[in-house]
Regions:
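Gly/Pro-enriched, hydrophobic low-complexity segments
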Residues: 86-88, 157-158, 162-257
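N-terminal leader/targeting segments and the immediate start of mature chains
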Residues: 1-78, 115-117, 122-137, 141-150, ...
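Short, charge-rich binding segments
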Residues: 72, 87-91, 95-99, 109
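Short glycine/proline-enriched turns and hinge-like loops at secondary-structure junctions
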Residues: 63-65, 92, 97-98, 180-181, ...
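Short amphipathic beta-strand/extended segments with alternating polar/hydrophobic composition
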Residues: 93-100, 113-124, 229-232
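Short, conserved active-site entrance elements at the starts or edges of catalytic domains
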Residues: 151-157
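Short, solvent-exposed coil/turn segments at beta-strand boundaries
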Residues: 45-49, 71-80, 97-104, 122, ...
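Beta-turn initiation residues at beta-strand->coil junctions
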Residues: 56, 83-86, 107-110, 219-223
Length: 258
């Protein structure tokens, strides 16, 4: 178990203008918490394309709610995230987020609303080496929608630094999730930005893919009761993607927001 803060989200290994994983692969044994975070930080550097499906189950006072999130990604810059209800008929309620690295397009089918906007520039100066580690952030090769499960799973550096490292972490050992070998980690009482979760009996467990460093499962409990279970049921690094994977035409009748 460790309570030492990890502040290496922004550490990058660069050679000839390219970034490389600082940790090429995990050893055969169990890593320490710090070693696991170092490995996770560079997850997206271990593949050129990615196909992933996440099923998220949220349990609250209003009952159970399940969401399906499909991700396609191609470095550098191209990403598509589709959020829907599992088993729903084609053309049902869904949301699409698509980026080519310069422009982000979104569409919400329920309200027939679309947007097309330039990617927001990140604040300047955050790469200043005089800044303490906790004040620096990971710069992704291919952006994903902020504060979403795809962002957390594929770009886990910020999650490790800003959430997991603020709690009491321990390695849980090897496990298999969706047919892939993973390392489990438990975090008790992590810092959160939402007051309902800022409790000493709030815990998180993650499963980290041994090959890529991607998070493939996230389980949250409060007071021993399950509140969220998100699992990557499909994970295909270096997947073959169709040429039209990142093409999108807004449906007829879309109202564009500016």
């Amino acid at each position: 178990m460790t309570t030492r803060l990890w502040d290496r989200a922004a550490v990058a290994v660069v050679a000839d203008g390219r970034r490389f994983p600082a940790v090429a692969a995990l050893g055969p044994g169990e890593p320490t918490v710090q070693e696991l975070f170092d490995f996770m930080r560079d997850a997206e550097l271990r593949f050129a394309t990615l196909r992933m499906r996440i099923l998220e189950r949220v349990i609250s006072t209003r009952g159970d709610d399940t969401t399906q999130i499909d991700v396609m990604l191609r470095h550098p810059g191209h990403a598509r995230v589709t959020t829907s209800r599992p088993g729903e008929e084609l053309g049902g309620t869904y949301e699409v987020w698509i980026s080519d690295g310069d422009i982000v397009r979104t569409y919400a089918a329920q309200h027939k609303l679309g947007t097309q906007r330039p990617i927001r520039n990140r604040p300047r100066g955050l790469d200043d080496k005089d800044f303490p580690g906790m004040s620096r952030i990971y710069e992704p090769i291919t952006g994903l929608p902020m504060e979403t499960l795809p962002e957390t799973f594929v770009h886990p550096a910020g999650f490790c630094q800003n959430v997991l490292a603020t709690g009491r972490c321990q390695i849980l050992g090897s496990r298999t999730v969706s047919g892939r070998s993973t390392i489990g980690l438990r975090c008790d009482h992590p810092r959160t930005v939402e007051l309902p979760g800022d409790r000493p009996d709030h815990s998180m467990e993650i499963s980290v893919d041994r090959d890529t460093g991607i998070i493939v499962r996230l389980v949250e409990t409060i007071g021993g009761s399950l509140t969220r279970d998100a699992v990557a049921t499909v994970l295909e690094p270096d997947a073959s993607l169709p040429p039209s994977a990142f093409d999108y035409t807004f449906p007829t009748g879309t109202t564009m927001l500016f």
